[in-house]
Amino acid sequence: MPVLLCACGKQPSQTVELNISHARKRALALFELKADQGAVLLDSLRPDKKGVCRFRVPCDSLRIYLLASSDNEHFLCLTPMPHQDLRISANYDSLVSSATVQPIPATDSLCPSLILLAYQQQIAQAERTIRSYTDTWMENRYQSTQVDSLHEACTRAIDSVMDTLRQEARRLCRQNTANLIPVVVINKAIGNRRVLDLSEPETLAFLLDCTKQMQRLNPQNPHVKRLMFQLARIDSYRKQEEIRLLEQTGEEPQIP
């Protein structure tokens, strides 16, 4: 992941306030995920003795931020609404699984970061579950007298976990076209398993439809523009491949 250093400058801003336990003088880094640059480092802070520190970020548009501990193994993804401050409590060594997110002031209105946190925690739990099934298979594949049955059971269990994630990802994309949650969700994967498989025509069509809705609501947002470009390019390539294969078989192309 490319990382650049960037200063926020003096402009209208909002606050991301952290209350971190077990920080032990270790720093936290806040990145902005840029559509054309990747992760750009905004600031790095050490929580005070009470575990508190505050980042200030621009509040002029929808943006995506990544909060990371010093090992950079797990990123807590945040998508605050403009002018919406956030208060985050978490354990330093388990940012995602232990985090709670609260908009400041408390409000009944949409808080995308809270919605996205729930999905990140669901992903983290799914990773642990899949790892458990994988370990069970690896530890017993040479000992079990019913290898085929064991493999089938583990595969079926993993497929069930992925299917649950897939259904939730589609729901989030469908219900959050006014913010940037779909941009994050579309790229989620567990190992080499993408939650939403862009090679599936139906999935690609669904995501294109969601992105078109996002484009109508946020036509100038760089993340939305880039996502629309990427999905349209994949769709164009797929259609060209279908035409090529049909021409090879002598069939008449019937592509919508």
Regions found by a protein language model. Give the residues of each.
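Sec-dependent bacterial lipoprotein signal peptides
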Residues: 1-8
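A non-transmembrane, solvent-exposed segment enriched in polar/low-complexity residues
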Residues: 8-166
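Amphipathic alpha-helical repeat scaffolds of TPR domains
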Residues: 178-193
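N-proximal helix/coil linker or "cap" segments that precede and/or mark the start of modular domains
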Residues: 210-256
